[in-house]
Every structure is written in C-alpha cells, then in structure tokens.
C-alpha cells in the first residue's frame, strides 16, 4: 500500500525567525480589540448624538466627515464610506429618514424579500447592508466631485459605438440612468466624450424638512458636475421641461434619471423590469419621441480600481438594460425602495392573438409619495 504523504515539513528556521503570533490569531486579536474598544464605543456615541441632536449629527456627518474622507486616498475614502453605510444599515437610516421620517429601510427589506424570496436571511441581510453602503459611497463621490478629485479618476467605457453612432448621425441622444451604484457620477464622466451634456436633478433636496448640510452636499454636487459637461449643466426636473427640449434641439446628450415612478395622473412607460412589466415616468420617452432622438441607457460601477460606464445596445430597451444590471448587483440599487410604487401591467383576460393587457397600478398616493420623497 502506498504511504500517504504528510504535510510539507516546516523550513528549518532559527527560533527568532518564527513568529510567536500566528498571523490569523493576531488579526483576530486586533479585530477583537477594535470591536470592543473603538467600534462599539464610537457607534454608541454617534447613536447618542443622533438621538440628542439630529441637526448637529447631520452637520458633522455631511458637513465635516464626508469632505474629510473625500481628501483621503481613494481606497481609504471608499473604505470609510462603506463603514458609514454599514452603520446606517444598522440604524435603518438615510437622508430621507433624517428629513421626512421616511421608513426607507422597511420598504427596502420588503423589496429584497420579494426579489430574493429563495435566498437565506443572511444573504438578504447582505443585500440590505450593501444598499446602504452604496448610497453612502454615492454621497462620498458627491463630496469628491465638490473637492475636484474625481478629475484624476480612471474611467473605462463599454458599448460606446452605439453612442458615437447616434451622435454622428442625429446629433442628439437621450440617456436613461438610475440610482444604481455610481451612475450619478457617471453623468459627469460622460463629459469626457466631448459632447454637451444636460443632466437631471430634483429640488426635493431644497425642501424645508431637509437638513441644511444635506442640501448643501447635493447642491454642491450638481454644481461641480456642471463643470464636466462641456457647457451643459444639471437641472432640476421640476419646471424645466422647456429647457431640456431647447437643449436637445441644439444637439447634445440629455441624461434622465429614469427609475422613478410616473406622476399620479401620468400614463406610465411600461418595460420589463425585475421580472414584471412595470411602469415608469414618461419624461425620457417623451423627449426621445418629440425630437426623434435615440433612447439608450447607461450605468456606472466601480470595479478593479476604476469606474466603468456601460451603455445599452442600439435598439435594446433602455429600462430592460438597467434591469439586467440591477439583477446582477441588486445591493447596488440604492433606490430599490421605490419598487412598490411602479404600476404593474398584468393580463386581465385569457391570452389572445392581440395580446391585450390591462393595468393594475399602485395607488396615486404611493406614486406621489415616491415622487416627492424620491432619491436626489
């Protein structure tokens, strides 16, 4: 019988060359010290501060902490932003909760349970945590835009041929994006293509309920993004439709944040999205139809030390493309709590040759709430 080989022999090292602390045990010891003497006391203090003075907490968080980590090396800044997001996941908080008392965390859990019903509770908890991490990363990137450090960040583009072809032939393009990963920052990166870009924001951040430090963070982000856009700018969607139309007539790229539900009295733009036919606001489609501009979409994600902007293919449904990206990385969709506000199109009769369908939508109240308190 062949003798089994034993483990490889340890090299004949001098006793002083052998670590008296096995690396695994040492790391565990350091993590234990950090958890009990730094992490827990710090979390307790921040939780106490938030309860005692929410205004002071948000001022320190948005007005001091985010600008501070924006000046750090990217790896450090992203790590601290994710840690901030994990803390917010633990508390079930984000800026909408600070501002409106909105129960974003409860709707988020409901969406995860709907879309990942077959997953274990631990796997769903990881998605929940990732959602808050990525919203925190988006706010970190907002601070980085204001600091001007994003100009040196490397960017790669995928699927660019369709975009360049559309601009060469029709001189105008409507792009849909979403509250997913780094896609808002991706709007600024589009300026590198050389075309004027007009992006969409929302005046929800100016409401009186929103802490001043939060409003400043988002307004500074929008202003900083405008410097990337080759003469374009970021405009609030509320009340500025004529300016979007005039800009597109002249020629350029208009970016619409498209993962918003329709207004209560608006006819939805339906698309296959996360397993069902769901209805969205019509703004992007209406602009495209009005000016015969191609309608495409993009997402932006951070991977392997750089950002990647990925475009849909010509002729591909732009919302279905976004759906496919979200499906692969659900935790990066930090507006997933709006899923329940999308009207759902379902069959109201037996299938026929005409394929007629009926609409079963959410209530006008739910849609209005999502619009008024939606992500910026």
Task: Provide a role label for each language-model segment.
Residues 171-236:
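Catalytic core of membrane glycerolipid acyltransferases/transacylases, capturing the structured
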Residues 2-177, 182, 219-224, 366:
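Membrane-anchoring hydrophobic helices of lipid-metabolizing enzymes
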Residues 104, 182, 217-219, 240, ...:
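Residue-level preference for nonpolar/small residues embedded in alpha-helices
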Residues 192, 236-376:
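Non-catalytic C-terminal accessory region of glycerolipid acyltransferases
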Residues 163-164, 187-188, 222-227, 244-245, ...:
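Short amphipathic alpha-helical segments and helix-helix/interface helices
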Residues 140-144, 183-185, 207-209, 263-266, ...:
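Short catalytic/ligand-binding loop motif for oxyanion handling, primarily in non-cytosolic enzymes
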């Amino acid at each position: 019988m062949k003798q089994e080989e034993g483990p490889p022999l340890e090299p004949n090292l001098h006793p002083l060359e052998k670590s008296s602390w096995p690396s695994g045990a040492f790391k565990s010891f350091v993590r234990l010290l950090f958890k009990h003497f730094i992490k827990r006391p710090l979390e307790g203090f921040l939780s106490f501060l938030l309860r005692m003075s929410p205004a002071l907490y948000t001022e320190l968080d948005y007005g001091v902490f985010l600008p501070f980590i924006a000046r750090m090396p990217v790896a450090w800044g992203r790590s601290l932003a994710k840690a901030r997001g994990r803390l917010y996941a633990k508390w079930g908080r984000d800026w909408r909760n600070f501002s409106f008392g909105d129960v974003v965390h409860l709707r988020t859990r409901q969406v995860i349970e709907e879309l990942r019903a077959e997953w274990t509770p631990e796997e769903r908890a990881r998605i929940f945590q990732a959602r808050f991490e990525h919203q925190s990363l988006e706010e970190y990137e907002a601070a980085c835009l204001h600091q001007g450090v994003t100009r040196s960040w490397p960017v790669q583009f995928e699927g660019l041929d369709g975009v360049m072809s559309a601009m060469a032939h029709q001189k105008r393009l409507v792009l849909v994006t979403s509250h997913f990963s780094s896609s808002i920052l991706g709007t600024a990166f589009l300026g590198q293509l050389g075309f004027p870009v007009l992006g969409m924001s929302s005046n929800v951040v100016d409401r009186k309920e929103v802490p001043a430090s939060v409003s400043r963070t988002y307004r500074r982000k929008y202003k900083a993004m405008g410097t990337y856009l080759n003469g374009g700018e970021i405009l609030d969607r509320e009340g500025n439709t004529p300016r979007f139309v005039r800009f597109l007539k002249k020629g350029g790229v208009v970016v619409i944040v498209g993962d918003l539900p329709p207004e209560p009295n608006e006819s939805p733009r339906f698309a296959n999205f996360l397993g069902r036919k769901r209805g969205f606001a019509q703004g992007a489609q209406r602009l495209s139809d009005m000016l015969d501009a191609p309608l495409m979409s993009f997402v932006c994600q951070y991977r392997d030390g750089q950002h990647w902007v990925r475009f849909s293919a010509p002729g591909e449904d732009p919302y279905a493309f976004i759906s496919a990206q979200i499906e692969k990385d659900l935790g990066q969709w930090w507006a997933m709590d709006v899923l329940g506000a999308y009207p759902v199109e379902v069959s109201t009769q037996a299938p026929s040759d005409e394929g007629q369908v009926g609409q079963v939508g959410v209530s006008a109240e739910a849609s209005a709430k999502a619009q008024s308190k939606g992500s910026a």
